[in-house]
Design a protein with these regions (language model features):
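NAD(P)-dependent short-chain dehydrogenase/reductase
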Residues: 4-63, 68-77, 107-110
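C-terminal substrate-binding subdomain of Rossmann-fold SDR/epimerase-dehydratase oxidoreductases
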Residues: 48-155
Length: 155
């Protein structure tokens, strides 16, 4: 897998790599249709179309949402870092460190909600521990999900 290759190239060729695991990226140009569309993109499209927001399962699954500009900043911080050699070849979580249920996210956008059957194998909880990336690269996310949603829907 890609993470093992990065670690191997760091060890064998002294190539400075870092491995980032991004948590539920969102932003202004996110997909709004298709299998890779995030829940925020789908909800905003449904709101714009006057449709009810569709929640899969009970809506209590929790997600750690990370703004795309915060993800870009994490990459920049790592690229310009003077971190110790021990930092390279390591895995870092890039997330907000806060998670929201899908129901909570939907409630930020609309009261018009419908539930559909759950998908098999869907993760119940994602939550990034961002201590390692903060301690190594002094990175923290800046964008608050609730503020971003309000801006998108004009509140």
């Amino acid at each position: 897998n890609g993470e093992k290759l990065c670690k191997m190239y760091t060890d064998l060729f002294d190539l400075d790599t870092v491995i980032f695991r991004y948590f539920n990226a969102y932003g202004e140009r996110q997909p709004i249709r298709g299998q890779y569309a995030p829940v925020l993109g789908i909800f905003l499209r449904q709101l714009a179309a006057g449709e009810p927001l569709t929640i899969v399962g009970d809506g209590e699954q929790r997600r750690d949402f990370t703004y795309v500009k915060d993800i870009v900043n994490a990459n920049i911080m790592a690229a310009i870092s003077n971190a110790d050699k021990d930092a390279y070849g390591q895995v870092y979580n890039v997330g907000s460190g806060v998670n929201y249920s899908v129901n909570e996210v939907a409630a930020m956008i609309s009261d018009d909600i419908k539930y559909i059957p759950p998908r098999l194998g869907e993760a119940r909880i994602s939550l990034a521990n961002v201590d390692k990336i903060y301690n190594t690269f002094a990175w923290r996310p800046l964008q608050n999900l609730e503020e971003w949603v309000k801006k998108q829907i004009g509140k």
